[in-house]
Amino acid sequence: MRLLLTIVLMFVAFVLSSPKEGPDMQLVQPYTVDSLGACQGISYQKGKLFLYGDREVGMIREFKMQGDSLQYIGHEMKLTLNDTDVINHPTGIAYNGKDPVFIGNSIRLNKEGTLWRAVIYCVNWEGLQKTGTLDGNLLNTIDDDTCIQGTRPEYVQYNKKWYVATADYGDKKNEVRLYDPAVLKNAKKTSEKGVLYKKFTCTPWVQNLYWLADKGQLLLIQNQMEGRRWRFTYVDLAKSIASGQQEVIKVIDIDRADELEGFTFLNNYDKGFAVSSSRRNNVNAISVHW
């Protein structure tokens, strides 16, 4: 009996001391945020939350935390140039506070979704926030011709250097690719020499990316099927680059039937917001436990 008790105690101690593989995520509270069109993503920057969507033109709205929800502060940016809609379907804002800022645009060219044009825009982010349009703030337009289906830029760090990661949405030959921002900012297309640094294969339906810098993990924000249901896939970036395929830490499926579009953590990795393209309940507080 004493031996059995000792074994049980040792097992419990082992379980408690073992590192947990990835977090648990739980939907806490849905909110409805209007005037976004179909929300395409969310970016958290120095206490500010930027939600972007495809209303009558591509646009970005700034919010702040108000208790556990978001409050619109009355600041909107239209992604237009000379009153013409340029970034009509924004899909990702690559921002790290020191390198050039890039915004993605994924354009469906046919109803079947087999033909896409993906464009990455290098922008003056501070100027865009001040003036509210791309006039005078569009620095370069880059054709992401290396992509397979769409582009969704996000900064990641690998071997102490920053890269712009992006991924495909479709169900064939999906990849995560890392671009050199110093070369990308002056390029006309991503197939130019020196732009693409590394790549690895990944699972389908990636809507957006999020970099967990302190953990060395890249979060793939996905649908479980085309345009439907929520999936979060945590991958080890360094191992994925080394092997050439995603090295999964954990996959989390949340029981929501609509189209997950984006996600961001807040200051710590214990709380975040997920956004969907729905007209109602399109912004959702998420609790995260590691």
Per-segment meaning from a language model:
Residues 30-59:
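Beta-strand-rich domains and repeat architectures in extracellular enzymes and scaffolds
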Residues 30-35, 81-85, 141-148, 197-203, ...:
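Surface loop/turn motifs at the tips and blade-to-blade linkers of beta-strand repeat domains
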Residues 48-79, 127, 131, 230:
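Beta-propeller domains
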Residues 57-64, 110-124, 172-181, 226-237, ...:
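Structural motif
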Residues 69-107:
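Blade-loop segments of beta-propeller domains
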Residues 199-242:
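Loop/turn-rich, solvent-exposed surfaces of beta-rich toroidal or solenoidal domains
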Residues 243-267:
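Conserved blade-ending motifs and adjacent loop-strand segments that build the rim/top face
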